[in-house]
């Protein structure tokens, strides 16, 4: 293969890597768990969870029950951990 062909192949592979959707990236398993809705162990606080069907972080009121880890204090933290 010529050097031009190799450069073209390398460019295409780089482009494909950049276009890989976030949904195919690996997320922690707890991002796919349901958040602890309607469970009250303390005061309800504004929180965010990763909604696996919408593939985005969503606001909810967290009752402070540590059922799983799919709850975050900020949208940016949720996005960083689960959305990519």
Swiss-Prot record:
Tissue-specificity statement: Expressed by the venom gland.
Key words of the record: Disulfide bond, Ion channel impairing toxin, Protease inhibitor, Proton-gated sodium channel impairing toxin, Pyrrolidone carboxylic acid, Secreted, Serine protease inhibitor, Signal, Toxin
Keyword Signal set for record: yes
Disulfide bridges in this chain: 31-82, 41-65, 57-78
Listed InterPro entries: Kunitz_BPTI (IPR002223), Kunitz_BPTI_sf (IPR036880)
GO molecular function list: ion channel regulator activity; serine-type endopeptidase inhibitor activity; toxin activity
Residue(s) carrying Pyrrolidone carboxylic acid: 25
Signal peptide boundaries: 1-24
A Gene Ontology cellular-component term: extracellular region
Coiled-coil regions listed: none
Further information: Negative results: the heterodimeric toxin does not affect ASIC2b, ASIC4, Asic2a-Asic3 heterotrimer, Kv2.1/KCNB1, Cav3.3/CACNA1I, ENaC alpha/beta/gamma (SCNN1A/SCNN1B/SCNN1G), TRPA1, TRPV1, TRPV3, TRPM8, P2X2/P2RX2, and 5-HT3/HTR3A channels.
Assembly: Heterodimer of an alpha (Kunitz-type) and a beta (phospholipase A2 homolog) chains; non-covalently-linked.
The family this protein is said to belong to: Belongs to the venom Kunitz-type family.
Protein name (record): Kunitz-type neurotoxin MitTx-alpha
